[in-house]
Amino acid sequence: MTPEHVTERKALVLLKFGSSAWNRWRDENPDIMIALDGVNLDGMILTGVNFAHVSLRNASLHATNLMNADLRSADFTGANLTEADLIAANLEGAILRGATLREADLLGANLTSAQYAEEDLRGALHAPVPRRTAL
């Protein structure tokens, strides 16, 4: 049996109803795989949204409010998160390779085990300071 996938169109309709409607649908459909690769979510208010394990490769989330969002293991490869509000977002295990986070606010965000290079966070507000080993 192959896992079900949600269509991009259905996902976007659900998101227009807000985070609560989206999260309720996710709770009712935990086995459905979600790929929102290349979608435009610019400026949307998605506070507290559950995007855990969602593929958002090359998506545009410019100035999107993702405060307190569950973004665990989400794939943001090549995504545009410029000026995104990621305050207190859970990005544990998220893939941020090649993502643009210029002026994104990461205050209190959990980046434990997130996959990124220093340049991916360049220009982000409240970005974690990379740890350097002493010589």
Model-predicted segments: where are they?
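Tandem repeat scaffolds
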Residues: K10-V13, F17, A21-L135
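Eukaryotic low-complexity, mixed-charge intrinsically disordered interaction/regulatory segments enriched
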Residues: T2-A11
